[in-house]
């Protein structure tokens, strides 16, 4: 048997979130409440991703209906503990992942073994009732363990992330602006700019000059024309003027007579993105001004305090990212530029590390931030984020949902063909209320859909009235929740459609990985998928 090599097994994942991200996944322990098809689809994706361990909690036994809904169960599993049966199959997917199961009711874990909950990186409730959801949400919110409620009901799926605070070390912003510091060049870069004389270059040298140097040379002319050493193009007209200066540097080829040159085309195309003031984004500003920077001993906030001090001491600039975009150039000048940027980024990171050691000493903690962590943090300093959440409160969320329905513009001609996502959210709340009061879900136990639809409609109306301060809005809002939609959710009969479980479970696992790696931005905080239209929406409650 070949030795296990994480970098080989998880090669594609490592390309997404790096070795440090995979290491975070490898230390993640997940507790999943439930073992139905939704739970196993979530766990399947986590096990294949390489989490350290998982723990399944469910007191259900395998029944005939489970065999048709869950690919991880077989006919000979009927009568067995469903948690144990799914555990058996899931651990076969990845031998490096350990798993365990408990046949106790999920509520017992929240009421009797809170200390055990603190050992998990995340707790997931798969198709649990509202009482279990709210019980775990309150306990886990206070001990800062992320809690995710996931439900599927027929063609509808929802995900609700409950977390007190989630820190993001790299949001992986799409198409980030290059950090070239055109308005604030560092000393070594200034030396190279001053050494560059376009007039003395041969045509071949000019056509292989990196466009960042062309930008700086065009900026010099731009400033001379204005007799202002601090001038910087900030309007469309000024950037067009700078583009014209750039293109005036071109020379004609004696052979072809044309001025075509790839590096000048790149320089012109990059002007809009490159010529932006080097500023700190609002998200990072709010983090650096947070009281947590001054008091917290958690690693993220320790290094954020060091970053805040660095910014204060360095003209309100973040550490240099240290990477260059691809550009046409000869190898010697591009290598020199890349080296200058890398060395400056390393120097900035070392200064942040020094400040971090100061903060650690002041707060009475050990060296919790390693050199590598500090360097990665500084490289992505403009992409740090923090999300804050509230404890799960279904009653408060219902008020927000009803307000969304009030604000929605529903087309009278198509309202029976397409149901608004907020309406589905309200119907899912009504389903939860129905289950709590009747001990079963609408459309089950052989009760005709028409009867349960009438019962469910009454609960929808009660929820709307509870959420409203003014009764006069009741009719207009309740009319937006059509009888067709109510009958449809009853028609589902609490069915678990594997295709919906697989899709929603995959998204949920992706969100868990975001929480585990502290990379990418998780859903904030509610997601709903409508299988009728294959459309989804997010809400912040």
From Swiss-Prot:
Assembly description: Heterodimer of uba-3 and ula-1. The complex binds NEDD8 and ubc-12.
Pfam families from the UniProt entry: ThiF
CDD domains noted in UniProt: APPBP1_RUB (cd01493)
Keyword Amino-acid biosynthesis in annotation: no
Protein name: NEDD8-activating enzyme E1 regulatory subunit
GO molecular function: NEDD8 activating enzyme activity
Alphabetical keyword list: Ubl conjugation pathway
Function comment: Regulatory subunit of the dimeric uba-3-ula-1 E1 enzyme. E1 activates NEDD8 by first adenylating its C-terminal glycine residue with ATP, thereafter linking this residue to the side chain of the catalytic cysteine, yielding a NEDD8-rfl-1 (uba-3) thioester and free AMP. E1 finally transfers NEDD8 to the catalytic cysteine of ubc-12. Required for rfl-1 (uba-3) nuclear localization during early embryonic development.
Species this chain originates from: Caenorhabditis elegans
Knockout consequences: RNAi-mediated knockdown causes the formation of an everted vulva in the L4 stage, with the subsequent rupture of the animal during the L4-to-adult molt. Loss of rfl-1 nuclear localization in a 1- to 2-cell embryonic stages.
Cellular compartments per GO CC: cytoplasm
Chain segments annotated as coiled-coil in the UniProt record: none
